[in-house]
Amino acid sequence: MGKLTGKTALITGASQGIGEGIARVFARHGANLILLDISDEIEKLADELGGRGHRCTAVKADVRDFASVQAAVARAKETEGRIDILVNNAGVCRLGNFLDMSEEDRDFHIDINIKGVWNVTKAVLPEMIKRKDGRIVMMSSVTGDMVADPGETAYALSKAAIVGLTKSLAVEYAQSGIRVNAICPGYVRTPMAESIARQSNPDDPESVLTEMAKAIPLRRLADPLEVGELAAFLASDESSYLTGTQNVIDGGSTLPESVSVGV
């Protein structure tokens, strides 16, 4: 039996990147999956995992729209009966200098990275409270609360907010049997990281990823499956005394005082 056997997990932003990695790890640990995404690609992953014998349901929704989220959660519960674990993973990042960033791009981060998390949590939490049992895993970042990079002001703002939300929910609903913890990844080899690299250097994005890796003590970007294993730990009984925590998985990237050429 896996550490998540018999549990049903709703994972947002699951069609690619970290969300896909979490879905694959959760399936390996025995969870029943509800994969929520705005992209049609979510059906492909659900079909693949289902074809391998995992119980997996895909639901389409825009996390910015509370009515859309409510409808998706209702459809999912018709299939699975309940949601034991929520992984708020859906997120975006667009580079832009603070003074040059449009209100549209600013709100794009706020609407998905903050309001989206708020909406999905609000739709799922009441039934967890009724059962007095639930695990919520938030996807924050080292960016925002710990470090900052030029061009990522809106992203940093949104991810720092998730830390505050995590701690507040952990305190507010601890007596209801709900545990809430955040994951703070550094650079992970995902379509988002590749998009940031293309925005930084359209002519040679791979060189940007190479430089990212050089600045990390472990000299590589994380694999989404590694983040998935941390999420599985936080969603399982193995972390039964953890709530309100920030769990950094960054290969040591936040350790150096400055980037060095090495010795």
UniProtKB/Swiss-Prot annotation:
Listed EC numbers: 1.-.-.-
Chain residues that bind NAD(+): 10-32
Catalytic residues (positions): 155 (proton acceptor)
Keyword Oxidoreductase assigned: yes
Pfam families noted in UniProt: adh_short_C2 (PF13561)
Keywords: Oxidoreductase
Keyword Oxidoreductase found: yes
A molecular-function term among this protein's GO annotations: oxidoreductase activity
Record: residues binding substrate: 141
Family membership: Belongs to the short-chain dehydrogenases/reductases (SDR) family.
Protein name: Oxidoreductase UcpA
Organism: Salmonella typhimurium (strain LT2 / SGSC1412 / ATCC 700720)
